[in-house]
Structure formats: structure tokens, C-alpha cells
């Protein structure tokens, strides 16, 4: 879910100046109600459901706090583009829920504020009920697929954690499931990732980082980084491969291709992801969980990068053969 980082930071540097240290150097307690700023990473850590109103994400206020002057018509245009009203309605409807319960309600709930997606799950028995497995999969959608993965794995394990862009902490119902990755501070991001891999939790992980793109006529992930292989070996985590059978609309892929042809590095097609999320409303997609791959498999026969590519290829084989065995 790393690419759903289109949401602006809610608090400006000016806000930090009005805060005081609490508990030594670990946190800053701010005057704003129920908000704690964790030094360099902004985290909403203690929001009571009663404090969540119908307009929880207030784009106008966010822009003002960031000292961005924008005409009202521009704000309205951004609100429509980012589907702020719909996201707020989902947050408000499910404000009493948290963790896996929030993810399941938002993904499968039939209320108009939710997505009402029908999940078709295969291989849930392949998720170990004990130990510290790492569920690794493709990332076709950039949002609802991650929520659906939490929903699905949460039927077997209650201890799931997901490393995500720290902006996603502004979805209060999900924050307890996240390891927030600070995209600005690389050293802090690496430390948080290390903490996630070292934890005893069931870890959900998208090795591509970004959601899938159209490549040679097929929707596939970009390169899978080898980090998950190295950490699986270091922390003795068996890998559960997971294939999600879904895709965004063609306009997302066309915009991504146009950006690439123009030589633009910034992935501005990300701004379409909220619309793509709601385009999944009422649809069905499947998630297939393959047989666990023991961490001891990843030996010196191949480099970590080669192992990562082999696991990626195996994940895509699950589409046609859910019972496929990983071939080293």
C-alpha cells in the first residue's frame, strides 16, 4: 500500500513549535486534542471515536496549515479528485471499529460508504496459525488490495502488521495494523522496516513497493526488491505467497505510460488511485494463498535478487495453479 501516499501531512512545522517534550526524547505532546507527534514522523496515535466527525479529513484546513494558498475552486477540484468526501464518509461510518474489523467492514460492507467488494479466497489453510510468517504478494490496485489482504489474513491471524507509507496513519481505524514508513527520512524508514521484520507478528509485505503497471500488455508488478528475502532468512520467517487477481482501469495505466514517455519521474498517476479504489465498488476479486516456502529454501544457490524474482514468478503462477509448489 505504499503508493497511497497522496494524502497531505496534517500538521505543519509550526504545530511542532507549540508542542512540549513528554517521556524524555521519544515523543512530543501537542496542544491539539488527542494528537502525539512522534518526533520526525507525524502519527495520529490516540484519537477517540467520539472525536471523529463527518469531515475528519479537511483539505482546506490541511492546505492552510501547510501555508498553501489555493482558491476555493481548486480545493473543491482536489477534493473531488481525491474522493475526500467518500473517504470521510467511510471513516465516519466505521469510526467505532479498528484494525481487522475496520478493514473488513470497509472492504466488504454493503453500505454505500463502503466498497462492497466480494472476496473470493483460496488457500487460507496455507497461512500458518503459529509462528511468524511473512505474506508476500503482488500489488495490483494500490489500496483496496492491501485492505483485502488484511481482511483475508485476519481470518486466520489476529497479529498482522503491514509496513506502509506513514501518511496512511491518517486512517485512524487502521493505524494499529501499520508499521509507518517515513518516506522522507531514509534512515528512520530503514529502522522501522528492521523493527517490522524482527517482530513476532505475521507480516504482510508488497516487495514491489508501488502498485502494478501495464507491461507488454500485462498488468504486473515492477521489480521486486530483494529485502524481503534477506530479512526472511535473518529472522527465520517462512514466506506465504499470495496472488491478488485484480486490476485498475486503463486510464491509470495510460497516464503512467504517458508520464514515462515524457521522462517525468514523479508518479503523478498516484492521484488517480482514490478514484480507482472506488471504481472497485461492488466488484469481486480473488486472493490465492500458496503453500508456505520455508526460509531455509533461500540458500546460496541464487542471489537474494534472483530468489526475489523466483518468488515473484511463483506468485503469478498461482493464478492458474493454486496448488503450485515453489521450484527453487
Segments predicted by a language model, with ranges:
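Residue-identity detector for glycine
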Residues: 2-5, 17, 24
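Short, positively charged and aromatic/hydrophobic N-terminal segments
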Residues: 9, 14, 36-38, 43, ...
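Ala/Thr-enriched low-complexity intrinsically disordered regions
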Residues: 25-29, 41
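Membrane-anchoring hydrophobic helices of lipid-metabolizing enzymes
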Residues: 42-133, 146-148, 155-157, 168, ...
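A conditional alpha-helix N-cap/helix-loop micro-motif detector
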Residues: 117, 183-187, 221-222
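Conserved nucleotide-cofactor-binding alpha/beta core module
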Residues: 154, 158-198
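Non-catalytic C-terminal accessory region of glycerolipid acyltransferases
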Residues: 190-328
Amino acid at each position: 500500500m505504499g503508493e497511497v501516499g497522496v494524502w497531505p501531512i496534517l500538521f505543519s512545522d509550526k504545530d511542532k513549535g507549540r508542542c512540549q517534550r513528554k517521556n524524555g526524547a521519544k515523543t512530543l505532546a501537542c496542544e491539539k486534542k488527542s494528537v502525539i507527534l512522534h518526533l520526525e514522523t507525524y502519527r495520529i496515535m490516540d484519537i477517540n471515536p467520539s472525536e471523529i466527525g463527518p469531515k475528519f479529513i479537511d483539505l482546506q484546513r490541511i492546505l492552510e496549515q501547510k501555508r498553501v494558498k489555493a482558491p476555493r475552486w481548486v480545493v473543491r477540484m482536489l477534493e473531488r479528485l481525491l474522493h475526500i468526501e467518500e473517504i470521510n464518509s467511510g471513516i465516519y461510518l466505521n469510526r467505532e471499529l479498528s484494525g481487522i474489523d475496520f478493514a473488513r467492514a470497509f472492504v466488504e460492507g454493503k453500505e454505500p460508504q463502503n466498497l462492497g467488494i466480494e472476496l473470493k479466497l483460496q488457500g487460507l489453510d496455507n497461512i500458518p496459525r503459529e509462528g511468524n510468517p511473512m505474506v508476500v504478494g503482488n500489488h495490483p490496485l494500490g489500496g483496496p488490495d492491501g485492505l483485502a489482504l488484511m481482511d483475508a489474513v485476519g481470518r486466520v491471524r489476529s497479529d498482522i502488521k503491514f509496513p506502509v507509507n506513514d501518511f496512511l496513519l491518517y486512517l485512524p481505524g487502521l493505524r494499529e495494523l501499520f508499521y509507518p514508513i517515513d518516506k522522507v527520512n531514509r534512515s528512520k524508514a530503514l529502522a522501522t522496516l528492521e523493527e517490522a521484520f524482527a517482530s513476532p507478528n505475521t507480516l504482510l509485505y508488497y516487495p514491489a513497493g508501488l502498485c502494478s503497471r501495464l507491461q507488454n500488455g500485462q498488468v504486473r508488478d515492477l521489480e521486486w526488491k530483494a529485502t524481503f528475502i534477506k530479512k526472511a532468512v535473518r529472522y527465520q520467517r517462512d514466506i506465504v505467497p499470495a496472488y491478488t487477481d485484480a486490476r485498475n482501469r486503463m486510464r491509470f495505466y495510460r497516464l503512467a505510460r504517458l508520464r514515462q514517455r515524457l521522462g517525468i519521474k514523479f508518479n503523478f498517476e498516484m492521484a488517480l488511485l482514490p478514484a480507482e479504489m472506488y471504481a472497485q465498488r461492488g466488484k469481486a476479486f480473488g486472493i490465492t494463498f500458496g503453500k508456505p516456502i520455508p526460509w531455509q529454501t533461500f540458500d546460496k544457490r541464487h542471489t537474494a535478487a534472483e530468489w526475489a524474482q523466483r518468488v515473484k514468478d511463483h506468485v503469478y503462477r498461482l493464478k492458474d495453479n493454486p496448488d503450485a509448489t515453489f521450484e527453487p
